[in-house]
């Protein structure tokens, strides 16, 4: 079943509203992409409005981590999800979202990109 993001077809009281038109293609949505820690990076392409393509990162093994103290960036392996400000269950399930704190080979890092929307994990190294 698809995700519908148009206006509700029922009133607060439960009665039906008078509908002057049907559903439109621009009102469809999709299920959220829950990026999980895995042994390799797996991406999938999705067609979006206007015929454009969106790259979704479904499984992640590596992150681009920037060290702000010396300005260098490295591609490092993700070991685990420590904490997630979006949902406390995400850390337990190993789901990476923007704002999550991940443990990498070089230390803890804060995720700054949206993996389900951008197809890549960018992060900032946290000071120890």
From Swiss-Prot:
GO MF assignments: structural constituent of ribosome
PROSITE patterns: RIBOSOMAL_S8E
Assigned keywords, A-Z: Ribonucleoprotein, Ribosomal protein
GO biological process, one term: translation
Cellular compartments per GO CC: ribonucleoprotein complex; ribosome
Gene3D superfamilies: 2.40.10.310
Keyword Ribonucleoprotein in record: yes
InterPro entries given in the database record: Ribosomal_eS8 (IPR001047), Ribosomal_eS8_CS (IPR018283), Ribosomal_protein_eS8_arc (IPR020919), Ribosomal_Se8/biogenesis_NSA2 (IPR022309)
Entries under NCBIfam families matching the protein: eS8
HAMAP family recorded: Ribosomal_eS8 (MF_00029)
Subunit-structure text: Part of the 30S ribosomal subunit.
Family annotation (PANTHER family): 40S RIBOSOMAL PROTEIN S8
Family: Belongs to the eukaryotic ribosomal protein eS8 family.
Protein name, entry field: Small ribosomal subunit protein eS8
Lineage of the organism: Archaea, Thermoproteota, Thermoprotei, Sulfolobales, Sulfolobaceae
Gene: rps8e
